[in-house]
Amino acid sequence: MQIIEGKLQLQGNERVAILTSRFNHIITDRLQEGAMDCFKRHGGDEDLLDIVLVPGAYELPFILDKLLESEKYDGVCVLGAIIRGGTPHFDYVSAEATKGIAHAMLKYSMPVSFGVLTTDNIEQAIERAGSKAGNKGFEAMSTLIELLSLCQTLKG
């Protein structure tokens, strides 16, 4: 039996985009900082890293599709924060963002990591953006790095 998995180390020539929603920027700025930190710590070249900003989480799938279609990137780390409010808006936005991101990843067969927080309140979001529960942006970039490595291994 053979176990095949990715490594948490970049080769240094991977072109990566971080796609970030600006809405709830107090949270998403921290997620983005965590993702950038992870990229640099694991061998990424800052000159090969692009930050792409969109107004809100609903727009993430559309721009992700454009980024993957361009074939400029080896992978994309998607970040956002959707916080439940008093209306069903949260349910619609989180469902469509999640489905759209998954669809684009499968459509282009490209590594994409999901760092979109879906929380019941601002406190939960803050906890996941660098306090009690770690930084989910850092974790999302870690996932992308492993996916990139695994894809290289599977290519042979």
From Swiss-Prot:
Pathway: Cofactor biosynthesis; riboflavin biosynthesis; riboflavin from 2-hydroxy-3-oxobutyl phosphate and 5-amino-6-(D-ribitylamino)uracil: step 1/2. It is an enzyme of class 2 (transferase). The active site is at residue 89. Keywords: Riboflavin biosynthesis, Transferase. It holds the Pfam family DMRL_synthase. GO terms for cellular component: cytoplasm; cytosol; riboflavin synthase complex. Its EC number is 2.5.1.78. (2S)-2-hydroxy-3-oxobutyl phosphate binds at residues 86-87, 128. It catalyses: (2S)-2-hydroxy-3-oxobutyl phosphate + 5-amino-6-(D-ribitylamino)uracil = 6,7-dimethyl-8-(1-D-ribityl)lumazine + phosphate + 2 H2O + H(+). One of its GO terms (biological process) is riboflavin biosynthetic process. 5-amino-6-(D-ribitylamino)uracil binds at residues 23, 57-59, 81-83, 114. SUPFAM superfamilies: Lumazine synthase. GO terms for molecular function: 6,7-dimethyl-8-ribityllumazine synthase activity. InterPro entries: LS, LS/RS, LS/RS_sf. PANTHER family: 6,7-DIMETHYL-8-RIBITYLLUMAZINE SYNTHASE, 6,7-DIMETHYL-8-RIBITYLLUMAZINE SYNTHASE DMRL SYNTHASE LUMAZINE SYNTHASE. Belongs to the DMRL synthase family. NCBIfam families: lumazine-synth. Catalyzes the formation of 6,7-dimethyl-8-ribityllumazine by condensation of 5-amino-6-(D-ribitylamino)uracil with 3,4-dihydroxy-2-butanone 4-phosphate. This is the penultimate step in the biosynthesis of riboflavin. This is 6,7-dimethyl-8-ribityllumazine synthase.
